[in-house]
């Protein structure tokens, strides 16, 4: 502010000390201006002017120090500022008045006026900004104390705002969390309700079933008892028996906890009300009915003798049981008292039933029956007392159960491991839960009462369904007589008259179930017989015969198996009841027969499977034997082939030696013999060349292997024959010529090409070579009559078979004959 003051003092236009503004009259001007501002306060507020700075600056001038050079300058600045503001305000007033006049006079020039107003508003905003800047500058020239106070106030305000916002956020988080928890709990409840509704929709009796945990624990307990029995019989050590007893105790603890949860369902008010209406009375504890005083029970004395219980053990167990008996009596008495109280509450407060006192009051008073159905409203104290008694009943049930289990645990302290195991097996030998029988009973119940009630209209009754088949029947007084008459009309014996008849005999009648309205299932809703209401003391009229009654067979035989069809029904009953227990025994016998048939069928199937397996094993054994025989035959053939080859080699060697000897003995005869009569004999070199040719053919045609082997053997035999004939020629020239001719023929036959044998060659894939080979060997061995080779061959191969004499000269024929002839020769040889 000092530089501003200097500017004002240095400005020539600023008033001098001798000017009229510096006179004492100047002190009156701010008050006058302030009064004018207060008078026009509403107008300034309408135009959004802020006069806080001017108003607050007035006390600062009044509270300023004594007048000096600086004070005069400040007063002059304030006066100039106020003068400017008054001028601007007067201008604004005039402009507003002009605008109002123009708006009233010139309605047609609204757009121009709006533009002018916008321009004026912009000018006014600019003026306001300038004025606010001036006011801020003037405020900055205030005292430092005011700045510090404002800063502290702003800090305090900010801190308060931060704290408030923080608290709000925290409250918001807590609220959101609470709402999420509520939503989660509602969703869980909704899911549980959906599951319950689904169960009730499928089968309303599912909630009354034993849970899967109970069934599992019962079967587990039964299995443990069996294991303990086996351990005792096998005389296992005490450690293993002790481990089994520990597992049994843990499973019993789980079963007791599950039973405590089941008690809550039975103590429910609705369940107790149903039991009260049905007239149910509680009985004693079934877990302790088999023993009351151990000293008086025969089985206990026998157990003590077999288990070798001492006198101390017997005394302690008897004392323990007496204490248990006393406590159980007290609990049973309390349970009966609570049961009587609960029944009385239900029968007097909720389900009002008649008693002698009420009947006497009604007879004595002769008052009319009140129209209202509701009785007196109960007080909260009575309801609370009833709930307390229900909770007390629950606790008593739990206490009885725990007392029994704790007593059994205490008894184990006085017994050894084997004695306890023996007692456990003895008591629980017959304690079991046959859940399969329970499921079968439940399924039959549901089938007769719920599952079949789906498609038939509700107007038809279970005991008397309207049908046209019994319209001609006479009147009767009961439903049982009408049903028996229907059965007799259709040729079916009644249950009372034919106790020995089985349900299968009922299916023999083919005319059963023929009616106009044939229904495949039971009616959906069972309704009572509609009769007119009668007065209390007037006798009821006789029962009229039902018209159009449908046969019972149409209702049951189409949907329920014959083993489960009831044969008679009571009047107006919602469920089917057997009239005679013999029918039920017959059904059981039929079920047993069916089970036996199934078992026989299973046994027969098992026997067939065993027979098939045995046959397969036999077939496999035969196949293995045949394979071994074939292998042996092949080995024998290979051995015979090898022996033939060896014999051929030996014969060739002998022939060579004989030729050399013959050449040395008669060189002149060999030289004089004519060349045209020399028979082409197979020398060893020619034999080797022929084998090479056969091998070449064998490379091109693998299936001719057997034929080449046969050629080799034939060549060897022919060469032996030639050698023998040559030896005879040395002695007889005439015979030599004939033998040479025979040798020529044999050589010509041996030189037959392979192409001529293709028509008669054996099939290699059918293994006919194995059949032809022995025939050729036999024919070769038989063809040499009185020759040296045949004699030597018979000596070397004495085990080789020989053919009959009629086949001695049939070597070539056997070799070139077709396959079927070879097979015939094989058959003849085998014979």
Curated annotation (Swiss-Prot):
Residues 130-143 have a biased composition (Acidic residues). One of its GO terms (cellular component) is nucleus. It is found in: Nucleus. GO terms for molecular function: DNA-binding transcription factor activity; sequence-specific DNA binding. Residues 54-85, 97-129, 469-484, 497-510, 674-695, 720-750, 787-800 have a biased composition (Low complexity). Residues 176-183 are annotated as: Leucine-zipper. Its main location: nucleus. Pfam families: bZIP_2 (PF07716). Residues 151-214 form the bZIP domain. Residues 153-173 are annotated as: Basic motif. GO terms for biological process: regulation of gene expression. Residues 1-33, 54-166, 469-510, 658-697, 715-771, 787-810 are annotated as: Disordered. Residues 101-141, 601-664 form a coiled coil. Residues 87-96, 144-154 have a biased composition (Basic and acidic residues). InterPro entries: bZIP, bZIP_sf. Belongs to the bZIP family. Probable transcriptional regulator. This is Probable basic-leucine zipper transcription factor P. It comes from Dictyostelium discoideum (Social amoeba).
């Amino acid at each position: 502010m000092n530089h501003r003051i200097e500017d004002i003092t240095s400005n020539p236009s600023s008033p001098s000390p001798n000017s009229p503004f510096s006179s004492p009259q100047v002190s009156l001007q701010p008050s006058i201006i302030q009064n004018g501002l207060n008078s026009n306060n509403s107008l300034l507020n309408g135009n959004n002017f802020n006069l806080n700075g001017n108003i607050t600056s007035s006390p600062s001038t009044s509270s300023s120090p004594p007048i000096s050079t600086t004070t005069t300058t400040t007063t002059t600045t304030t006066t100039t500022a106020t003068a400017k503001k008054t001028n601007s305000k007067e201008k604004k007033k005039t402009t507003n008045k002009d605008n109002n006049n123009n708006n009233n006079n010139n309605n047609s020039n609204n757009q121009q006026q709006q533009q002018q107003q916008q321009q004026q508003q912009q000018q006014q905003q600019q003026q306001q900004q300038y004025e606010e800047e001036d006011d801020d500058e003037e405020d900055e020239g205030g005292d430092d104390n005011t700045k510090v106070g404002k800063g502290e106030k702003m800090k305090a305000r900010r801190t308060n705002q931060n704290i408030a916002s923080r608290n709000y956020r925290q409250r918001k988080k807590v609220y959101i969390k609470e709402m999420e928890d509520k939503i989660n709990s509602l969703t869980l409840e909704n899911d549980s309700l959906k599951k319950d509704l689904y169960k009730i929709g499928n089968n309303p009796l599912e909630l009354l079933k034993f849970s899967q945990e109970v069934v599992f624990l019962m079967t587990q307990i039964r299995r443990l008892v069996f294991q303990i029995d086996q351990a005792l019989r096998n005389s296992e050590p005490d450690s293993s028996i002790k481990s089994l007893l520990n597992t049994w105790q843990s499973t019993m603890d789980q079963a007791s906890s599950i039973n405590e949860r089941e008690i809550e369902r039975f103590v429910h008010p609705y369940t107790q009300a149903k039991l009260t209406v049905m007239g149910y009375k509680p009985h004693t504890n079934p877990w302790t009915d088999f023993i009351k005083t151990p000293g008086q029970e025969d089985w206990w004395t026998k157990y003590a003798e077999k288990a070798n219980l001492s006198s101390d053990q017997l005394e302690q167990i008897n004392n323990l049981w007496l204490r248990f008996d006393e406590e159980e009596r007290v609990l049973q008495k309390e349970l009966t008292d609570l049961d009587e109280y609960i029944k009385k509450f239900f029968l007097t407060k909720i389900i009002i039933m008649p008693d002698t006192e009420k009947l006497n009051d009604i007879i004595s008073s002769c008052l009319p029956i009140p129209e209202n159905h509701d009785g007196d409203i109960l007080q909260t104290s009575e309801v609370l007392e009833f709930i307390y008694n229900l909770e007390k009943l629950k606790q008593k049930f739990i206490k009885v159960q725990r007392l029994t289990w704790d007593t059994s645990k205490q008894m184990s302290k006085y017994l050894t491991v084997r004695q306890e195991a023996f007692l456990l097996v003895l008591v629980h030998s017959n304690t079991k839960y046959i859940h399969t029988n329970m499921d079968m009973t439940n399924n039959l119940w549901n089938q007769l009462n719920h599952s079949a009630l789906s498609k038939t209209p509700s107007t038809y009754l279970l005991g008397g369904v309207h049908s046209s088949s019994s319209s001609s029947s006479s009147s009767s007084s009961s439903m049982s007589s009408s049903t028996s008459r229907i059965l007799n009309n259709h040729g079916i014996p009644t249950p009372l008259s034919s106790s020995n008849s089985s349900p299968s005999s009922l299916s023999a009648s083919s005319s059963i179930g023929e009616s106009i309205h044939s229904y495949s299932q039971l009616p959906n809703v069972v309704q009572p017989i509609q009769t007119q209401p009668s007065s209390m003391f007037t006798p009821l009229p006789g029962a009229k015969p039902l018209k159009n009654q449908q046969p019972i067979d149409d209702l049951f035989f189409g949907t329920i198996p014959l083993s489960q069809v009831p044969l008679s029904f009571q009047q107006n009953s919602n469920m089917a009841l057997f009239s005679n227990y013999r029918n039920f025994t017959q059904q059981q016998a039929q079920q047993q027969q069916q089970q036996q048939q199934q078992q026989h069928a299973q046994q027969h199937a098992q026997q067939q499977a065993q027979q098939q397996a045995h046959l397969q094993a036999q077939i496999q054994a035969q196949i293995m034997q045949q394979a071994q025989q074939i292998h042996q035959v092949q080995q024998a053939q290979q051995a015979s082939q090898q022996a033939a080859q060896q014999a051929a080699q030996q014969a060739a060697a002998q022939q060579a030696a004989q030729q050399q000897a013959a050449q040395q003995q008669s060189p002149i005869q060999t030289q004089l013999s004519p060349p045209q009569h020399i028979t082409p004999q197979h020398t060893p070199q020619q034999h080797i060349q022929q084998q090479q040719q056969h091998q070449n053919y064998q490379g091109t045609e693998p299936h001719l292997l057997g034929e080449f082997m046969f050629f080799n053997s034939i060549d060897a035999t022919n060469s032996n024959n030639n050698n023998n004939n040559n030896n005879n020629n040395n002695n007889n020239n005439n015979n030599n010529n004939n033998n040479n001719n025979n040798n020529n023929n044999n050589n010509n036959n041996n030189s037959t090409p392979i192409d001529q044998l293709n028509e008669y060659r054996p099939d290699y894939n059918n293994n006919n070579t194995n059949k032809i080979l022995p025939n050729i060997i036999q024919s070769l061995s038989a063809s040499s009559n009185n020759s040296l080779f045949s004699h030597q061959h018979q000596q070397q191969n004495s085990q080789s078979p020989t053919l009959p004499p009629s086949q001695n000269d049939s070597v070539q024929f056997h070799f070139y004959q077709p396959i079927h002839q070879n097979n015939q020769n094989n058959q003849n040889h085998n014979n």
